[in-house]
Amino acid sequence: MTGNETRDREPAWVNLLNFMIHQEMEGRVSIQLDFLPNFGLIFSVRVLEELKTTIEVLKGQESQRLRTFCTSNCMEPRRDLDSFGRFLMIGTLDELVVDYAARMDIKTKAGMEPGGAIKAVANDLYSLRWGPIDTPIFNLLGLFMQIIPDFRCKYISLADFLINAKVPVDGRDLSGSTALSHCYSTKPGFDLEYAELLYKAGGEVNNRNRYGTTTAHEIAQVYNRSDPSSVQKATKALEWFLSHGGNADIADGDGISPRSICAAIKYMVPQLLAVIEKEDTRRALRGNTCCSLCGRAPSADEKLLMCGRCKKGRYCNPKLRACQKLDWPKHKKECKAL
């Protein structure tokens, strides 16, 4: 019996599955396999274009395929920048001020009150995206700092102006990463001054991207573990992350946390796990006076909210931070035990 005759006698679903696996290997689709009682093995297929439009945390092959796309494609100034993006790249603050005034003038002439016009212009600027991975405005400025480091101070001034103009700093690119996530991940950005600026403007250090990872996941994956400068940079970045409310136990879509990565490489890079354990001790000493997830103590006019079920977990106000939501996958095991 020939190979073709054998394939002809195979069930249709086997031929279809083989075809779809071949398509996935070529990067055209993503296959999700599941086993359902009474139905057996089923699979669902999502093409890359569909993955781009979804918002949920991805895992497995879907996560890897979107990651591959985002790391293989980037914003190229000559190809992707419009006129506004090009003058941002030049870094002239005076021109940005003039552009902003013109946008405000359009809104007020349309009948908006000053407060409404400020919000509308801020939303317009927040909504802007460039390139194949939908780079937002603060991410764009961070990228410019990598491309033209001599203009870095100019880009910081532009970012500061936009922050004062009430433009939110939490815009996400196609990977779900914010400007804050990019600028201290160490791959390739490491700019703690820009990170501090974005953090004070409301940036969330525990932001999870489309793969479910926080910046700490990237920091923990030190590419060159034998290079002292790489290890030192990663250690400093992790210290900044934790000291600004970062949590090392938030798991990605496949259940892996920064703590588990640091524990796995502790014999090669012991500094990272040591940083986490030092922060564990600091937060433990604070006891019930700090948030269970981020370790922040509330300000004088705020108070921590307790888990309604176990009364043990304490969290920041959900209107300010999503600490309880982020901690739930870990806390629910302890909560049920209680």
Located regions from the model:
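Ankyrin-repeat-protein effector appendages
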Residues: 229-338
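Ankyrin-repeat intra-repeat helix-capping/turn positions
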Residues: 91, 154, 187-190, 223, ...
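Conserved ankyrin/ankyrin-like repeat signature
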Residues: 95, 154-158, 190-194, 237, ...
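Tandem repeat protein-protein interaction scaffolds
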Residues: 144-155, 164-165, 185-193, 200-203
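Ankyrin repeat domain, specifically the short helix-to-loop turn at the C-terminus of the second helix
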Residues: 98-119, 157-169, 194-205, 236-247
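Ankyrin-repeat boundary/"N-cap" motif
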Residues: 76-85, 113-147, 171-186, 208-225, ...
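N-terminal segments that cap or nucleate solenoid repeat domains
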Residues: 3-140
